[in-house]
């Protein structure tokens, strides 16, 4: 996956401190049981999506994975984003900190987010997105449409 560099870490929800369990720069994926993928859209949308995913995960015995895609401009090296990784980690820890249980947080530095999602999501992955709905498609709604075209079942958690 030359389009992106993954940075993986595990965050115990309910604990705003983020502790990197694993930071990798390879495409290796640990084998896990059934997982629900939450893709970051906005703070409010992601918070809503995490609530929905956590409710589903409790009933299904699934792991919740929060995926944050950061598009690095072509003018910068992929290994040197404009935003620091510690800042992104703290931001995601703050989002995840209000939920019980555990979530796996993955930060991907990429050039093209949709291409990175196509490469990293296993076939038919259950995806939860959050965001507002309007009569014109929002960014989150367009992402929902693209993921459905790639064959992923998508649950849209609407913010109010």
Each model region followed by its residue ranges:
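Structural beta-alpha unit
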Residues: 1-30, 99-127, 134, 143-154
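Small/aliphatic-rich secondary-structure junction motif
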Residues: 27-79, 150, 159
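Glycine-rich, N-terminal phosphate-binding loop of Rossmann-like dinucleotide-binding domains
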Residues: 40, 131-132
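A conditional alpha-helix N-cap/helix-loop micro-motif detector
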Residues: 46, 85, 107-110
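Short helix-loop-beta junction
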Residues: 59-60, 91-102
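Short beta-strands and strand-loop turn motifs
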Residues: 68, 127-131, 158
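Acidic, Ser/Thr-rich peripheral helices and adjacent loops at domain boundaries
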Residues: 79-93
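Membrane-proximal amphipathic alpha-helices
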Residues: 138-139
């Amino acid at each position: 996956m030359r389009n992106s560099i993954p940075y993986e870490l595990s965050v115990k929800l309910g604990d705003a401190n983020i502790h990197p369990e694993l930071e990798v720069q390879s495409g290796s994926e640990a084998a896990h049981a059934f997982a629900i993928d939450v893709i970051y859209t906005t703070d409010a949308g992601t918070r809503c999506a995490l609530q929905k995913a956590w409710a589903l995960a409790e009933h299904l015995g699934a792991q919740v994975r929060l995926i944050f895609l950061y598009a690095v401009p072509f003018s910068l090296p992929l290994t040197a984003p404009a935003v620091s990784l510690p800042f992104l980690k703290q931001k995601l820890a703050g989002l995840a900190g209000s939920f019980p249980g555990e979530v796996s947080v993955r930060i991907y530095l990429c050039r093209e987010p949709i291409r990175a999602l196509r490469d990293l999501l296993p076939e038919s992955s259950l995806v939860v997105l959050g965001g507002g709905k309007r009569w014109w498609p929002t960014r989150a709604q367009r992402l929902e449409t693209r993921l459905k075209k790639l064959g992923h079942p998508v649950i849209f958690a609407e913010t109010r």
